[in-house]
């Protein structure tokens, strides 16, 4: 479902466990204030905003069930076609549309195939949205 406005969470990019990087999908791990009311966990198409620029991103909000389940919700964004370091930067993460629920994958290969599909879906959604 489309929200009437873009839901946005802001925070500082911190070092995560670099698992995304290890499989070719580096993500910005955003540490956000605990008082945010969060949307449901899952994968979203959206944007990461900093320096007054908006970058297309595949966003994952959730518990990282494939690698090691976390109780708190982690917020990670894979910025499309982007390779700068953002550690320590204050960024906004804007959610445009829900793509799918979070799920546990039984292999890295399956996870990678799904992430590639998620990126295609993200591009398609954001293209329609602009």
Language-model segments: residues:
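Contiguous mid-protein beta-loop-alpha structural module that forms a pocket-lining wall or clamp
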Residues: 1-2
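Short, structured loop/turn "capping" segments at alpha-beta junctions
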Residues: 6-11
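Phosphate/ribose-recognition catalytic cores of enzymes acting on nucleotide-derived substrates
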Residues: 15-130
């Amino acid at each position: 479902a489309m929200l009437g406005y873009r839901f946005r969470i802001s925070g500082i990019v911190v070092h995560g466990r670099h698992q995304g990087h290890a499989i070719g999908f580096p993500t910005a791990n955003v540490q956000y204030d605990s008082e945010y009311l969060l949307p449901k966990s899952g994968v979203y198409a959206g944007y990461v905003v900093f320096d007054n620029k908006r970058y297309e991103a595949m966003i994952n909000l959730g518990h990282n069930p494939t690698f090691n389940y976390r109780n708190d919700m982690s917020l990670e964004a894979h910025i499309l076609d982007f390779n700068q370091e953002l550690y320590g930067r204050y960024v906004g993460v804007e959610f445009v549309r829900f793509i799918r629920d979070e799920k546990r994958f039984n292999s890295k290969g399956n996870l990678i195939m799904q992430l590639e599909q998620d990126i295609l879906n993200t591009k398609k959604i954001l293209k329609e949205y602009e």
